[in-house]
Amino acid sequence: YWRLGQHVGKVVGDRETLYVLNHPARYKLTVPEAIDRVHEIRRFGWTLDAVEVSDTGLYRPLYDTDEIPLARIATDDAHRPPHFGRAWIEVEAPRDRDAIIRAIRAGDFRTVFASRD
């Protein structure tokens, strides 16, 4: 979202699209600032379905709150090898892009973080 310099992830299915508020931790947003971003992006006419509660695969509990009115997902958002495989979501849905997107929107998934042994 260019007006705020905010990354919004776009996950494309066959008919469904999931939009994710990416990197609130990397932008060092407070929860009120993250909520303001959600409202600003929606005022512009964009849809948001989820917020990233991880940063390079590490859990950021600050954003795992009902105050942010979005599904809370985790990704490793890997840009470098040490970040690969740290975080993901597991969805109970048919192996179909649109079914997976609908399940995420409905909150029918669990967030998983790799153990830090």
Which sequence ranges carry the predicted segments?
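Divalent metal-binding pocket/active-site signature
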Residues: Y1-A34
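Charged catalytic cores and adjacent phosphate/nucleic-acid-binding surfaces used
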Residues: G9, Y27-D117
